From Swiss-Prot:
Gene3D superfamilies: AhpD-like (1.20.1290.10). It holds the Pfam family CMD. Keywords: Antioxidant, Disulfide bond, Oxidoreductase, Peroxidase, Redox-active center. Its EC number is 1.11.1.28. This is Alkyl hydroperoxide reductase AhpD. Antioxidant protein with alkyl hydroperoxidase activity. Required for the reduction of the AhpC active site cysteine residues and for the regeneration of the AhpC enzyme activity. The gene is ahpD. It comes from Frankia alni (strain DSM 45986 / CECT 9034 / ACN14a). Disulfide bonds join 131-134. GO terms for molecular function: alkyl hydroperoxide reductase activity; disulfide oxidoreductase activity; hydroperoxide reductase activity; peroxiredoxin activity. Homotrimer. Belongs to the AhpD family. GO terms for biological process: cell redox homeostasis; response to oxidative stress. It catalyses: N(6)-[(R)-dihydrolipoyl]-L-lysyl-[lipoyl-carrier protein] + a hydroperoxide = N(6)-[(R)-lipoyl]-L-lysyl-[lipoyl-carrier protein] + an alcohol + H2O. The keyword Transmembrane helix does not apply.
């Protein structure tokens, strides 16, 4: 199961996504670990079963066990943080920001891989989940660690394409296209 297989599942109306998926996974300013950790974290965050089934094995071919665990951890913890911090932002009451969050995130303290990579994966998941406060925080941390804007942009590009592919494939599976996707298996 590969990027190529997932690209084959995309219908003609999603040709741009097909091309974008190929380009973001082959031409990047990200290291291989950063790229495939971003792919894995974004696939998890996108909640698309088929997308995760198709992309995870290829991602695991490029990631150490520690990196795969760190990408999964980033996806899991950002699922929590993105809801929490996006909600605080939307409430528009700064008093909530002064309250202790009380949410455990110990796994991010020692992720077993370079913290820049985990920040990129957290940024990508935050992009998928639409948390502006988290995006700003992760971008600020990455820029403070000397990460170029082009690298940050590539992580966001990967996340946006993976998410769009997940939405498109899920729509196919839900609509009359279900048989078409299932038949491709």
């Amino acid at each position: 199961m590969t990027v190529a297989r997932l690209r084959e599942l995309l219908p003609d109306y999603a040709r741009d996504l097909r091309l974008n998926l190929g380009s973001v996974t082959s031409q990047s300013n990200l290291s291989a670990q950063q790229l495939w950790g971003t792919v894995l974290a974004a696939a998890i965050a996108s909640r698309g079963r088929t997308v995760l089934v198709e992309l995870e094995p290829e991602a695991l071919d490029h990631l150490s066990a520690e990196a795969a665990t760190a990408a999964r951890t980033a996806a899991a913890l950002m699922a929590m943080n993105n809801v929490y911090y996006r909600s605080l932002h939307l409430l528009e009451d700064e008093e909530y920001s002064r309250l202790r969050a009380g949410l455990r995130m110990n796994a991010l303290a020692n992720p077993g891989v370079d913290k820049v990579d985990v920040e990129l994966w957290s940024l990508a998941v935050s992009a998928v989940n639409g948390c502006g406060r988290c995006l700003t925080a992760h971008e600020h941390e990455l820029r403070g660690r000397g990460v170029a804007r082009e690298v940050i942009q590539d992580a966001i590009r990967v996340a946006s394409v993976v998410h769009a592919v997940a939405v498109t494939v899920e729509a196919l599976e839900t609509s009359s296209g279900t048989n078409r996707v299932a038949a491709a298996d």
